[in-house]
Amino acid sequence: EQRGWTVLLQAPPRKGIYGMANSKKKTIWVHPITEAMGIMPQTFVHEAVHAVQACKTGKMKPLGYKPALDYVVDRAVFNNLYRNYTSRKWAIEKEAFAIQAQPNRIPLIMGLIVEHCPIKPDEQAA
């Protein structure tokens, strides 16, 4: 939120999804049901990756971060991408899924936020 994004713990405007990031509205939604499902941290990190991907230009573009994934996770990510996303979104989604799958996902996303989304001097006073 320090970087101008709003984070909402409510159902995303699109049905059937657990999280959503809208770079035009600078808003992240995380569905409350993700807490009961035990996937809230992963969902939040995934959507936070999309916010970071949009920091510089306002449009989501891959950061170029390619963490190592074991074969099973890599195949699961690929199958999810193939079934649920258009090919033009694969790069940004693959990166978000890869980062959310890391055991150090929380410090990792915090570092990426600091690196790619610095607080502008005029925002620090707010």
Predicted regions and their residues:
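A mature extracytoplasmic/lumenal domain signature
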Residues: A11-P13, P32-T34, T57
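Short, solvent-exposed coil/turn segments at beta-strand boundaries
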Residues: G4, N22-K25
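Extracytoplasmic/secreted proteins, especially bacterial periplasmic and envelope-associated proteins
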Residues: I39, T43, E47, A91, ...
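Metalloprotease/metallohydrolase-associated module, dominated by Zn2+-dependent proteases
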Residues: E1-K15, K61-A126
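OB-fold/S1-family RNA-binding modules
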Residues: G19
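Catalytic Zn2+-binding segment of zinc metalloproteases
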Residues: A48-Y65
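Short pre-active-site segment immediately N-terminal to the catalytic Zn-binding motif
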Residues: K25-F44
